[in-house]
Amino acid sequence: MQRVIIVYNPRSSKQALIQDEVIKPMRAIKGYQVGKYEVKQMPVEENAKNLTKILMDGDLILVAGGDGTATVGLNAAMMTKAKVTLGVLGYGNFNDMANMLGEHKCEDLLVDFQRGSIRQLYPLEARINGEFFRYAACYFSIGMFAESTEEFNVKDTRNSLKKGKKRLAYSIKKLMRWYFSSRKRNFLPPDIQLNDTPINNMRIAKNGRKNITRGRRTTDVLFVNSDTVAKMMKGGNYWQRKDEYLVSHGKLKNVFRLGVFMMKSILFHLPGKVMSKETKIDFSTPSEIEIQAEGEYKRVQLTELVVKKSDKAINVITKS
């Protein structure tokens, strides 16, 4: 009998829909042994490790949730020694992973699974200061964009999403308010280097007896593997490629620069460079920054960040 492990977050703003559209129907279908894993209020890595403890060869990991919940399922599928298949149904704000794979209904996903509509996904892998951090199916980011995701963990924001507000429009509105109140801050240090090359045009100037650093600072660096980022910005189908992914960075404190960057990203694709080897970000002095993968963020003390394509691929269900 086919085992299905449903991964979901009981605190999700769409918990009622997940129960009605995924959990109850799955239990009613004959021929499946259905188990559940409830995402706990702990880091992605700990949730993923706990999930691996119940996985067996042949399991279907069925994620019903947003990109954060999907990241737990992805990391468990990458970490386990069992041969598993991952399916994702989007019940979040942006649903980049679910949209990338094309599945939207539980019944359709099961039909595609039975038909063998399965492809290999090559996720990104990040290492912080030489230590493994996390896998990401869609993207990693550091800087301003990463810090903005904290807005969705604010109690008032979560309550508003649960009340059924238009999620995309509401989310964009919240992010823009946050941007205008936060854009003058320094999100990344001035001495940031990408593959040993400085990406800031900074200079030291005199202000009385003090030396001050002037110039436009980089606010964001993104590593993109998916068709979309935050639902609107266009990436590419790098997730199916063994080596390639996109690296994009920008100086986005200026409203005009942000507008140009967003217009290019929405109408065409994210500006950046396609990489086929690992990318190293480093600072001359340790800096506390925010890093996030698919909406799951963490503040870390960073001297070096290395991102590359993982050597391991996993099987994922895609729309036939």
Annotate the PLM regions.
Residues 212-215, 231-320:
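ATP/nucleoside-binding phosphotransfer catalytic cores, i.e., glycine-rich phosphate-binding loops
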Residues 160, 225, 312:
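Catalytic core of tubulin tyrosine ligase-like
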Residues 7-9, 89, 224:
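Short hydrophobic segments within beta-strands
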Residues 9-11, 91, 319:
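Cofactor-binding loop segments of dinucleotide-utilizing enzymes, especially the Rossmann-like FAD-
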Residues 47-48, 70-71, 230-231, 300:
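Short, well-ordered alpha-helical microsegments
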